[in-house]
Design a protein with these regions (language model features):
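Terminal, non-globular segments
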Residues: 1-172
Length: 172
């Protein structure tokens, strides 16, 4: 197994286990932070897309199993992984089609505004899909908006702290 494959797999295990054992048991203002989206955000851009979708599918299934959400997390993770490239283009103004640049390069070489825009787009979209499918009703629109906004804010703050604590400077 090459270094990049091993690194991706270890990050996968670490983030998923952290979500299951720690963050699923935390409630802040009635929402549980979803830090597992960090794995998608730091997933290497030069990695095979099929493997990215496979990792997201497996992560979603594992999280659904431990969260009793019946495929909702899997669905929202797969949609978010598909939209990641478009959010990079929107937030950073371009995307390297040759895949020479890494996600860390985009994050390191850009302004704070662009970084925050990218994180908000990723987390907000994921949370909106997650809670919309969970509610599956327009009658609960205010509940979906409240949960989406609170969960996005809390997840971004805790994810940033999580990255600062556990990942090196290259991953930021």
């Amino acid at each position: 197994m090459s270094n990049i494959n091993l690194l991706v797999f270890l990050r996968f295990l670490f983030i998923i286990i952290s979500q299951i054992l720690i963050f699923n048991n935390i409630l802040i203002f009635g929402v549980s932070p979803n830090i597992y989206l960090i794995f998608l955000i730091i997933f290497p851009l030069n990695y095979n897309k099929s493997f990215m979708y496979l990792y997201m599918f497996i992560a979603g299934l594992i999280l659904d199993l431990f969260s009793n959400t019946y495929g909702i997390i899997t669905f929202s993770l797969l949609i978010s992984s598909f939209l990641k490239i478009y959010f990079i283009k929107f937030s950073f103004g371009h995307f390297d089609a040759s895949k020479v640049r890494k996600t860390a390069d985009y994050i390191r070489e850009t302004s704070l505004y662009q970084k925050i825009t990218f994180l908000i787009l990723m987390f907000f979209t994921h949370q909106l899909i997650l809670y919309s499918v969970e509610a599956f009703s327009f009658e609960k629109f205010d509940w979906v908006v409240k949960k989406t906004v609170l969960s996005t804010i809390i997840s971004i703050i805790l994810s940033y702290i999580f990255i600062l604590i556990f990942f090196n400077k290259n991953a930021r």
